[in-house]
């Protein structure tokens, strides 16, 4: 995941880590009761599709925005056979409404919303999740 660019200059690994961190921070800040372990695992694996979606020769199809949750879920199931149904829901439905089936659990809804916020930040900010030498976030 570290070898693939997600949005702007952000790698897929940086993006997934940001979504996991901010999803957990959000549920704790708002006092949302949920399965935090599944929330973090699902967030870390939500874009586990393992290809460069910018390279049309590497991508399995031309509809990345619509199909990558399916590829991510397939890869996650192969590499992490202990995935729970909740973690599968997070991965499979994080692109709602592009994926027409809505999230079934609050954890999946949180990851879906935080993913969109992180993606927007990553498109418009250069390296937003990279720490500066002073120790602060770049944005």
For each predicted feature, which ranges?
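Metal-dependent phosphohydrolase cores
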Residues: 1-139
């Amino acid at each position: 995941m570290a070898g693939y660019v997600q949005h702007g200059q952000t790698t897929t690994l940086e993006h997934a880590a940001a979504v996991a961190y901010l999803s957990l921070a959000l549920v704790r800040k708002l006092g949302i009761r949920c399965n935090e372990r599944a929330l973090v695992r699902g967030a870390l694996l939500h874009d586990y599709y393992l290809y460069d979606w910018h390279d049309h020769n590497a991508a399995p199809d031309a509809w990345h925005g619509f199909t990558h949750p399916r590829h991510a879920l397939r890869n996650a199931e192969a590499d992490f056979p202990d995935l729970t149904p909740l973690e599968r829901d997070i991965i499979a439905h994080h692109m709602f409404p592009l994926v027409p089936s809505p999230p079934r659990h609050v954890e999946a809804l949180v990851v879906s919303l935080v993913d969109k916020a992180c993606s927007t930040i990553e498109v418009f900010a250069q390296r937003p999740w990279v720490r500066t030498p002073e120790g602060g976030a770049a944005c």
